[in-house]
Amino acid sequence: MPKSKRHSLSKFRNWVAYLIPLGLLVLAIALQAVAPPVLTQLQLMVFDEYQSLKPRVKTPLPVQVVDIDEESLAQLGQWPWPRNELARLVDVVSESGAAAVVIDVLLSEPDRLSPDVLGRMLPDWPEYQAAREVILDRVSHDELLAQSLSRANSVLGFALDDDHHDEIPRMKAGLVKAGDPPDAFLPYFGGSISALPVLAEAANGYGAISLVPDADGVVRRASMLVSVAGHILPTLDAEALRVAQSASTYIVKSTNASGQQSFGSSGGVVGVKIGALSVPTDSQGRIWVRYADQISQPISAWRLLSGDFDPAALAGKIVLLGSSAAGLSRPQPTPVLGVAPALEIRAQILETLISGEFLYQPDWAKGAEILSLVLLGLLLIWLLPRLGALWCALIGLVAIGTAIGGSWILFAQYNALISPIYFAFVIVLIYLTQSLQVYLASEKEKQEVRGAFGRYL
């Protein structure tokens, strides 16, 4: 082969050797920008591990769980309890000076044990007429509970359900919007399952009781506001904070509000102000739950009804009334506690909000990762044919170690969530691809040299 032709072929091979890793780098950056589900899941797994390694330190906070636990069911009978018993519970909590009593149980059906229901079940015979009139004269259990709710700083819940289309729940507070309309950014649900109207009207607060997990079923984030059939409504957690502060309005701040920059072309929610508390959120109006690895210390519900408790344990606190009993607990997976009852998860959400220990993903994180990938990727592609695999391996390892260490420090010291996993994967992939290209090119040159010597000999 003529020398000039061999030189041209060698240059072409060199260009091809660069194009393959460059193509991989471009593809990796495009995937990072699009954020496919598998990449998102890898990042979430890293964040879960960080939370497990450094959970929130449990400190005294004004949140108290009152648990309708197995012991309470053994003492007072199986669920559902008559609503007059729930009314007594609400009264005891309120009279103990609680800042708010939050019912973490969906009460969507009338009490089947109420006198009015039982009275209507009696046969319409003359011998039952007197008994029927006496029973129907009594106040219904639902009305008794409604009276208790109206006397207390109470919060009741409705369930989010795309397949149910009850009347849209009425928001109990005002809503002020600053910046872009938040409706398009909030989690959307087609419908809801409402609480019994007489109870919903009596409560001071009314919010979505449902916990919304990520695609893998793990509850990592909690919404402050949701969109139900196009109507913005608060969650139970947001309402608990509002009622506890006797606040009357939510202020939701989105991009393009005064002093706020857009996350990009789609914009997003920046934060929600609830009374005196400013809650920084992600673009969908959610917070990351900062889990502690210690569960809350509940008070068994039967102790409140029997008077066997210290009222000071409830005074000035947000009291969550729910159940951890089997069949009632609505358990869901969490990053730190394993599978936990919804009641415990709700307590952790409120503790996160009150403690102010908010996890967040910095706006600049994605841009910084792309820039780092471009710079280090190009550097490795250029250096590998010149310095060799060993030196470039050291450079790559130092860069990956720095990314992992920096990510951990940002989490541990500043509560920032930045995953190094994709950066590390792409750098290793580019290193291996370019190393293979260099090796194959070197072997090709050796074959050509041996072939040339063979012709001379």
Language-model features, listed with the residues they occupy:
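Hydrophobic residues in alpha-helical segments
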Residues: 304-305, 353-354, 411-412, 440
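Non-transmembrane functional regions of envelope-associated proteins
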Residues: 2-277, 311-391, 395
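Transmembrane alpha-helical segments that form the functional core of multipass membrane systems
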Residues: 359, 363-437
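Active-site Gly/Thr loop motif
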Residues: 278-300
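Regulatory cytosolic signal-relay segments
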Residues: 423-457
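Surface-exposed ligand/attachment interfaces on beta-rich extracellular proteins
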Residues: 303-311
